[in-house]
């Protein structure tokens, strides 16, 4: 941006060097002083997604994407994709979604589960009617470094959960510097699978940060689906689940051979293994279970959805079927450009990184289940949900985790000594949906007919689950509420689908954005531009007045028309551009899109960042997710 401005002052229109007066030298000094921030510091506009190839017809959803540096020494950058909420309920909320692995991209969640779009094919996006961005801002992050679109030097992959959470706090600090309007939101950390380790560690790191923070973050809840949270409870569950689901017959030869392996695993757990996150002898149980249950076509069970079969040795790694479209879509050059991927990211997008996974084998970190009691006791609400057809992180293990955990003066779902909270039948739109159970800040939901990636199978039901957990109040919004019932009784209204905002909600949002406006200006460097423009204006006015005053004194002041041309060229250079766009020239904007991209949809004027300001004064084996 500075180079664009300073070029306007270098020459007159005829090419002659412009001779600065004392006043113009003062202005140039001001520009030089402020130059480095203008050229190096990114603003929110640098992350703005102006178009998205294959998007449905109509205005594009408001979104930002790109990299935030978390480890300068090792070139560590985390990629994020953020969607602004489509409707405003009673409170402003942000849901941060993480997939597992470790080393599997949260683009799984964005394009196959809870994001606003799903792929119809590798060229075309369609709306996800159960998207989680309806009443919450939605933030997907590829982490740890090296995952998905994120990157780091190849000798600097992470090993421990504390390292991961430290990076994440740095990421959030910088994210909120760029987007201060979201810093006061209620924050919910959500994800699945190995994110069952990541999420509690990040939550603890946030609470630790808040102790000394000038602006504490409003962490309200955690949502973990089919989570790898307690290996000591999950490893022994494989055989139990296989028996219950009829994958293996008890007392069969196969069962007996697997029980021998299970006893070795149990011995490891009882001799220090309960404080470990990965135990090789226990991993063997699942591997052998899959290899000993091949069908007549020599296909194994899909470990993420036992209703399906897959080729050996994948056994689920080729699932879900949408994955065949996600990878080529995210490797398209126009998509990479639209999502503001840094040139330093040399390799194309991969769902799961083997290098990250093989490096992230914590030796010092304790299982995240040991962090849950203190989080619950601190007032953080926790929702554990399980798709009932998942094998690898099955619901039997999750239920055993809850039964064994002590917090808040009780064990498991005790409501009083020896008395447990009842299980409630949940129906959604007239069909059995699952089971709800709750006690002392912990909620458990078993989702019928769903896999390791429950939102993939049941987008509307899981959205309803989210809204209830966040206590979304849609009274002021309207629309047709979903028919969701517990034990036959209709629950407080939630809605799934598009609905207009209420006037009151819009006014509340405008006021919130107005309060954040100057903070956003100051952090993005726009205030600097305002100062420069004011300086130019004052200087120009002073010169004009002086010339008018002394015009009658012939020869005393020689009128140099180049001064006027500077201001004119400056105005012409900047007009028609986003005020936050730096030196992003309009011709460069045209270069973003190739001529054959006629089906892409661009945001209309009122959806740009600049107009918001004007308008609002506004996948180890745990992978693939």
Swiss-Prot record:
It is found in: Golgi apparatus, trans-Golgi network membrane. Residues 42-523 are lumenal. Its main location: Golgi. The active site is at residues 193, 390, 452. GO terms for biological process: apoptotic process; hyphal growth; positive regulation of conidium formation; proteolysis. It is a single-pass type I membrane protein. The chain crosses the membrane at residues 524-544. Its EC number is 3.4.16.6. Gene3D superfamilies: alpha/beta hydrolase (3.40.50.1820). GO terms for cellular component: membrane; trans-Golgi network. Residues 590-604 have a biased composition (Basic and acidic residues). Residues 1-41 form the signal peptide. It catalyses: Preferential release of a C-terminal arginine or lysine residue. This is Pheromone-processing carboxypeptidase kex1. The gene is kex1. PANTHER family: PHEROMONE-PROCESSING CARBOXYPEPTIDASE KEX1, SERINE PROTEASE FAMILY S10 SERINE CARBOXYPEPTIDASE. GO terms for molecular function: serine-type carboxypeptidase activity. Belongs to the peptidase S10 family.
């Amino acid at each position: 941006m500075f180079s664009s401005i300073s070029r306007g002052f270098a020459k007159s229109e005829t090419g002659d060097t412009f001779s600065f007066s004392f006043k113009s030298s003062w202005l140039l000094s001001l520009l030089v002083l402020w130059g480095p921030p203008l050229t190096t510091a990114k603003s929110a506009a640098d992350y703005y997604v102006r178009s998205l190839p294959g998007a449905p017809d109509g205005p594009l959803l408001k979104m930002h994407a790109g990299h935030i540096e978390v480890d300068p020494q090792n070139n560590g950058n985390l990629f994020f994709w953020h969607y602004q909420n489509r409707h405003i309920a009673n409170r402003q909320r942000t849901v941060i979604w993480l997939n597992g692995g470790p080393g599997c991209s949260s683009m799984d969640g964005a394009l196959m589960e809870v994001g606003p779009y799903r792929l119809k094919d590798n060229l075309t996006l369609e709306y996800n009617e159960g998207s989680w961005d309806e009443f919450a801002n939605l933030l997907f992050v590829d982490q740890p470094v090296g995952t998905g679109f994120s990157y780091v030097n190849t000798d600097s992959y992470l090993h421990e959960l504390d390292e991961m959470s430290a990076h994440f706090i740095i990421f959030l600090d910088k994210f909120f510097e760029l987007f201060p309007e979201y810093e006061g939101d209620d924050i919910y950390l959500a994800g699945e699978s190995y994110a069952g380790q990541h999420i509690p560690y990040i939550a603890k790191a946030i609470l630790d940060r808040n102790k000394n923070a000038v602006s504490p973050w409003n962490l309200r809840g955690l949502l973990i689906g089919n989570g790898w949270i307690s290996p000591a409870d999950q490893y022994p569950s494989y055989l139990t689940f296989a028996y219950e689901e009829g994958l293996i017959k008890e007392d069969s030869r196969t069962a007996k051979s697997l029980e021998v392996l299970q006893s070795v695993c149990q011995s490891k757990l009882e001799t220090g293994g309960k404080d470990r996150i990965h135990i090789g002898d226990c991993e063997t149980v699942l591997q052998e279970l899959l290899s000993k249950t091949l069908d007549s076509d020599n296909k194994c069970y899909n470990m993420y959805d036992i209703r399906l079969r897959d080729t050996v040795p994948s056994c689920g790694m080729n699932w879900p079927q949408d994955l065949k479209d996600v990878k080529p879509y995210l490797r398209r050059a126009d998509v990479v450009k639209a999502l503001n991927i840094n040139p330093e990211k040399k390799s194309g997008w991969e769902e799961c990184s083997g290098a990250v996974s093989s490096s992230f084998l914590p030796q010092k970190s304790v299982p995240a289940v040991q962090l849950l009691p203190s989080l619950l006791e601190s007032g953080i609400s926790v929702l554990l949900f399980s798709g009932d057809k998942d094998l690898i992180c099955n619901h039997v293990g999750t239920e055993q985790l809850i039964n064994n955990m002590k917090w808040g003066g009780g064990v498991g779902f005790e409501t009083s000594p020896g008395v447990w909270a009842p299980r409630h039948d949940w129906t959604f739109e007239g069909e059995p949906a699952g089971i709800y159970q709750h006690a002392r800040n912990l909620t458990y939901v078993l989702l019928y007919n769903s896999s390791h990636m429950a939102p993939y199978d049941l987008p509307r039901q899981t959205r309803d689950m989210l809204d209830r957990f966040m206590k979304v109040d849609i009274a002021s919004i309207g629309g047709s509420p979903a028919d969701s019932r517990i034990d036959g009784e209709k629950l407080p209204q939630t809605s799934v689908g598009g609905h207009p905002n209420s006037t009151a909600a819009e006014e509340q949002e405008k006021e919130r954005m107005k309060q954040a406006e100057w903070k956003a200006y100051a952090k993005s460097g726009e205030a600097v531009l305002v100062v420069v423009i004011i300086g130019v204006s004052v200087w120009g006015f002073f010169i004009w007045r002086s010339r008018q005053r002394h015009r009658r004194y012939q020869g005393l002041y020689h009128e140099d028309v180049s001064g006027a041309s500077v201001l004119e060229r400056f105005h012409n250079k900047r007009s028609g551009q986003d005020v936050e766009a730096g030196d992003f020239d309009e011709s460069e904007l045209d270069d973003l899109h190739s001529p054959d991209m006629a089906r892409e949809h661009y945001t209309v004027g009122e959806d740009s960042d600049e107009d918001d300001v004007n308008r609002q004064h506004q996948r180890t084996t745990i992978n693939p997710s």
